């Protein structure tokens, strides 16, 4: 079963935000961090096919302004009662018999049920508050250390302006049951008969605390000589203005060009993907476009010698099993472009990083860009999916899931519409059902799955994770292949 918290968030946002202005919170752990006036950074996406992520920086707007004072009060909107229930059952039976011969009969039933009842309300900052706030206060000097770091990396910074929160503690329960029975008889001199039955029940309960944020809206900060707040963010506007043009810095052979701060690793990746083609027309927004994007990235990996590939794979397998190592590696690569040489890391993250840098500590673009893309895809996936990818990498069974995910992405077009697809037996391998690796990989993406008659119910919200899963499988599989 997929994340119960994410399912609740998805249902609430569908009902209360038809304009698509709210950003869903993706984990219960981070749900308390998104509060009005809190500052967040927008982590650029490594692909056109999944959305950027927002990350709290543990600062409030008051931390970067002076004179020091509490934030103005927020407005509380009216409460909405949300109730969502699902109860479904599929059952069937079969009997095979011939006169005077063996008889075999069996039956099975599968049921799913869940229910959620909660009150949700909004907290928002009055738009007029920003004008008053910026008139009465100004940027703190010297600039806050965290802002200095974000400036050096060229990150865009936003402030949370509105949130949807739970009014009381909510318990979400989802149950999945399977039952089966069978009997047989073998006539003859000695009649042999037998029967059996069994059941399996899974129950997942998640408690969402009172005041948990389910979704939020943001405004963009623009920091120059003073602070401005853009209530309608402009994709072309940067929080920190780049240095004056004409500034040149030296480069070293095989290393990243030392570009002015503000040209982040992710922007270098996008430049690499487009290769002179306008961003809007780089790739079509369908499976063919996704496959073309992944192939563009993987071309660099095909040139690596087997020894380096093996070292990289061993490090990546370790990173997939260690969430802290994954975050440390992502952070190091993000800083590597704008801050110069990267600091060495320990453990599996360090093993991967050693494959991507020169002795000077500078990143090698031909190696770093594909890994940055891969990490961007991996961060879209859950910890459970990471562990399954590590196991598939170890057992060299990546191709089966890759073909299955690719087939589903191709069949489900257009991705913006719900649909139901049958699964060809040839793509399912030896097992399909609750707990099977392929089942769990898809279930964690937010898809509804059918077992007895294998099928998938496509949900538009699953697009980002499914595309990221395909990219992860394709790149890991490509690294694992022997050179042609």
Curated annotation (Swiss-Prot):
Region (Linker helix loop): 277-296
Lipidation (S-palmitoyl cysteine): 191
Keyword match Mitochondrion: yes
Tissue/organ expression: Expressed in the suprabasal cells of esophagus, as well as in the isthmus/neck, pit, and gland of the stomach, suggesting preferential expression in differentiating cells.
Modified residues (Phosphoserine): 185
Alphabetized InterPro entries for the sequence: Gasdermin (IPR007677), Gasdermin_pore (IPR040460), Gasdermin_PUB (IPR041263)
A GO biological-process term: positive regulation of inflammatory response
Record field: transmembrane: 91-97, 103-108, 180-186, 191-197
Residue positions, PTM Phosphotyrosine: 37, 158
Effect of residue 235 to D: Does not affect ability to induce pyroptosis
Phenotype when changing residue 204 to E: Reduced ability to form a pore
Effect of residue 193 to A: Abolished cleavage by enterovirus 71 (EV71) Protease 3C and human coronavirus SARS-CoV-2 3C-like proteinase nsp5
Effect of substituting residue 240 to D: Abolished ability to induce pyroptosis
Effect of residue 104 to N: Decreased effectiveness in pore formation and pyroptosis induction. No effect on cleavage by CASP1
Modified positions (S-(2-succinyl)cysteine) in chain numbering: 56, 191, 268, 309, 467
Site (Cleavage): 87-88, 193-194, 275-276, 290-291
Free-text comment about domains: Intramolecular interactions between N- and C-terminal domains mediate autoinhibition in the absence of cleavage by inflammatory caspases CASP1, CASP4 or CASP5. The linker helix loop inserts into the N-terminal domain. The intrinsic pyroptosis-inducing activity is carried by Gasdermin-D, N-terminal, that is released upon cleavage by inflammatory caspases.
Name this protein carries in UniProt: Gasdermin-D
Organism: Homo sapiens (Human)
Gene this protein is translated from: GSDMD
